[in-house]
Design a protein with these regions (language model features):
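Domain-terminus/edge residues, biased toward the C-terminal soluble/receptor-binding domains
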Residues: 219-220, 233-236, 240-241, 246-358
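Hydrophobic membrane-insertion alpha-helices, especially the h-region
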Residues: 37-51
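Active-site-adjacent loops and short helices of periplasmic peptidoglycan-processing enzymes
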Residues: 57-240, 249-250
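Hydrophobic single-pass membrane-insertion segments
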Residues: 49-63, 351
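N-terminal Lys/Arg-rich, disordered targeting/topogenic segments
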Residues: 1-33
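Catalytic-site microenvironment of enzymes
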Residues: 33-34, 110
């Protein structure tokens, strides 16, 4: 019996020891698993940290490099770009001036104080007609040479019979300066094509440059497909974009000198060597003496545009009695009478009253 009890006790002890060893192995496995997980976690965190530092450093270097190269360019120029411009995203009323709902758009801009005095639908896309030639002039003045002598091509005179033209014939030779006068004063479509071919190498290349320069000026709601403004459904702008382009042109004294003239005599040399002269009268009624500016307002000049689709349009450079500059624009009037009646009323209230108070 004693032997049996002893055997039972030994058996129990062996069982208990085995259970303890099993439990110990189990704990060790758990500990090893925990250690393994912790090691993996530490390695992962270390790798993430290293990657972050590398990425952060390269990103910082990239940002610094980008800022160094692009400061005062693109988005960095936003504040500077708008600082010298009249800016509004909404309509602006002008006390004393009654809105004309029949117009496509209208605006009056105080250039000295960078203030929008009046705005009605100035961000609405409309057909520009020959106000297109404002951008044609901008590109020509920027990239062309006014002393160049240009030979008129067959393409430049290949226009519909009812198109406004200066009267050139293929083979005629005329200076770039004369062409600019024909473009801006008389709104010659043949002058626009001749300028585009000479300055751009081709009409297509010149129009591409027009679009590039328009975007650079902030005229992002504008698209050109030709340099003259004869109707094309893919050619459009806004009254505000037109202000931006005209305002840029007005910084060039030559542009102001040309549009301020009451007439211009051009000298043309024909293909056979004969010379002849022609006189161009401005198409805007104020400069031509067919409309009278309001008291206290001096209309220096501007650019007109008229097609069936665009209606009657005009953009003007004006001064008050203190010679402070203003740009006024009306697009989409049903008739020229309405166009100039509304423009006179707008200038009288927005500019003339300021002069009377000085």
């Amino acid at each position: 019996v004693k032997c049996t009890n002893k055997n039972k006790k030994q058996t129990q002890n062996s069982y208990d020891a085995a259970r303890r060893r099993k439990a110990l192995r189990k704990r060790r496995r758990r500990q090893q698993q925990i250690v393994t997980v912790l090691v993996i976690l530490i390695l992962c965190l270390t790798a993430i940290g290293i990657a972050y530092l590398i990425h952060s450093g390269s990103k910082k270097d990239y940002v610094i490099d980008y800022e160094t190269k692009n400061y005062n360019k693109s988005l960095y120029k936003g504040d500077t770009f708008a600082k010298d411009l009249c800016v509004t995203s909404n309509n602006v009323s002008l006390e004393g001036y009654a809105d004309d709902d029949s117009l496509g758009a209208a605006g009056l801009f105080d250039i000295k104080n960078n203030t929008v005095l009046y705005a009605d639908n100035i961000h609405t896309q409309l057909y520009p007609a020959s106000t297109t030639k404002v951008m044609t002039a901008y590109v020509a003045l920027k990239y062309g040479n006014l002393d160049d002598i240009v030979t008129i091509s067959e393409n430049a005179v290949n226009l519909d019979a009812d198109a406004q033209v200066c009267g050139f014939e293929a083979g005629d030779q005329v200076s770039m300066y004369d062409l600019m006068n024909g473009l801006l004063l008389y709104s010659g479509n043949d002058a626009a094509l001749a300028i585009a071919e000479h300055v751009g190498g081709s009409v297509e290349a010149f129009v591409q440059k027009m679009n590039e320069e328009a975007k650079a000026l902030g005229a992002t709601n504008t698209n050109f497909v030709n340099p003259h403004g004869l109707h094309d459904p893919q050619q459009y702008t806004t009254a505000y974009d037109l202000y931006l382009m005209f305002n840029a042109c007005s910084k060039n004294p030559t542009f102001i000198d040309i549009i301020s003239q009451k007439s211009y005599s051009a000298t043309i040399t024909s293909a056979d060597g004969d010379q002849w002269t022609t006189e161009w009268i401005p198409t805007n009624y104020y400069s031509a003496g067919e409309a009278t500016p309001p008291e206290g307002v001096n209309v220096l000049g501007g650019k007109t545009g008229t097609t069936d689709e665009a209606g009657s349009c005009v953009i003007l450079y004006n001064q008050d009695m203190e010679s402070n500059p203003y740009i006024s624009v009306i697009m989409g009037a049903d008739t020229k009478t309405i166009l100039y009646d509304d423009m006179t009323a707008l200038l009288a209230v927005g500019v003339g009253t300021k002069s009377s108070k000085n």
